[in-house]
Amino acid sequence: MQIENITIRTKRMIDDLKTICANFGLGGSPGEYKIITQVFLYKYLSDKFLYEVKKADPTLANAENIEEALTAMPDDQYEMLTMMLGGSTAKLKKTHYISYLFNHQNEESMRKADGSPYPFHELFDDTLVDIANCNLDIFSVQTGGEEKIRLFDPISQYVIESAKKPLFCRAIINKLVEFSFADVFEQKYDFFAQIFEYLIKDYNKDFGKYAEYYTPHAIANIIAQIMVQGDVSNVTVYDPAAGSGTLVLALAHQIGEDNCTIFTQDISAKSNEFLRLNLILNNLVHSLGNVVHDDTLIAPRHLNTKKNGLAQFDYIVSNPPFNMDFSDNRDELASDKHKERFFAGVPNVPKKDKDGMAIYLLFIQHIIYSLAPKGKAAIVVPTGFLTAGSGIPKKIREYLVKERMLRGVISMPSNIFATTGTNVSILFLDRENKDGNVILMDASKLGTKEKVDGKNQRTVLSDDEITRIIDTFNAGKAEDDFCVTVSYADIEGKKHSFSAGQYFEVKIEYVELTPEEFTEKMNGFTAQLDEMFAESRRLEDEIRKQLGRVKYE
């Protein structure tokens, strides 16, 4: 089946699930995103299980009904078969199948172990919870206190009216049985990135807290292709403000999903749920145990092997929140306990506008502290960071130059993020760039404007523009008013400015003229000025005449 058809069918299924939620009064409710993402994932894991079972036992490949064939299989043989499945496949009981729920949705005679009636919505909820518990070790993420956050929770709890709970769950199961993911499992990152973005697009808006800023795929792909060139294997990738995982997923795809292990932390429960879904869809189940829900700045949870300090990572990417109120934690962050990590300082609490506290400066320092001796990093920062003349921003820039760990900077077009009007740049760090040149690029004039949701304006980069940015940066190629390569000494001579524009050569075009040509040009300019002055006097007279006709009535 063509990829376009698969995409259309998958999006239609997502839309149908959202319609069901709307029909039961759940459209736009806090619980809607949990229902949609959990039901989508239940369907995906169920179909993935059947897909992998066929690969493990070729005799099942031609079964007319794979679920019936599995149900008829002796229990010991079934258990052996599930043990043959890879670690990225959820283990399902025969009663977990979607077909089982579909076939039992109208059976009023079903009873619980204690003999009481077993309403269908309870059967549906119990199935989800049992799948989550059976796969707790593999598919869980964790809190900072190492408590496991399971894969599924009951969904009928979001329907307020008891009589409608079974109807809601029947509508869901009837929709799931119509669709199959069988054709998608051979698809790669680009397909799942598109589907994931479509799935969460209604639930990733206007959050405004840690890392819940959605990073455009263009930015993620630029970062990934600049950071990773050539073969890389057995490396670690980290994002301390991971959000839904766009940056780490793009980087993992560039490295190779089997060649890296992802580590993340984020304070947002919703972001961590989205990230888990994203990792599962992109064959990175082996990294789920490294997804932590907690405050990175106060309680960074990824420690070194001796557990006596923070872990260091080969690659770090992040689009941290730029400004937010962390006044309650400010003094603790500025204490001696964190002094080494926040070497350039911690922003003070302002008397007004606490929401404007520059928290991104702490994330930059945390990333520098967490970078391995040969590590590389890319951080999305407000463009004002590049030229700030004093304070913490300048101290950080001075440190990067002193330690010879700056690879370069790309200043992006305005409104590249639809959610913020702040101009942004990408700061690239490389601990091995001790003696190399630093690449400064001004891509702010690229892109075209488009409306998002009929409201916000966003700048979109074309494929050619993205390629130009990547190729020019990686080649270290100077280009007038676009890209320049400078030395660390050059940067020190410009007060540690990271702005490309301050290093561009100012060019004055000289044209050779004969005395006659010079006289002719000057006469032409004089004639033009005379005409403009005459027109100005005419307009002045006309305005005076019109004013003279104005009378009081």
PLM ranges: what are they?
Residues S29-E32, I36, Y214-A218, D266, ...:
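Short, conserved micro-motifs enriched in small and acidic residues
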Residues L167-A171, E212, T264, K352-G356, ...:
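Alpha-helix N-cap/helix-initiation motif
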Residues Q2-E4, N308-E553:
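A conserved structural/catalytic subdomain of Rossmann-like adenosyl-cofactor enzymes
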Residues K209-S318, N323-K339, V381-G384, I392-I396, ...:
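Conserved S-adenosyl-L-methionine
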Residues M1-I222, M227, T296, S411-S414, ...:
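Non-catalytic, mostly N-terminal accessory regions of nucleic-acid modification and defense proteins
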Residues K43-F49, V53, Y203, D231, ...:
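A generic secondary-structure signal for well-formed alpha-helical elements
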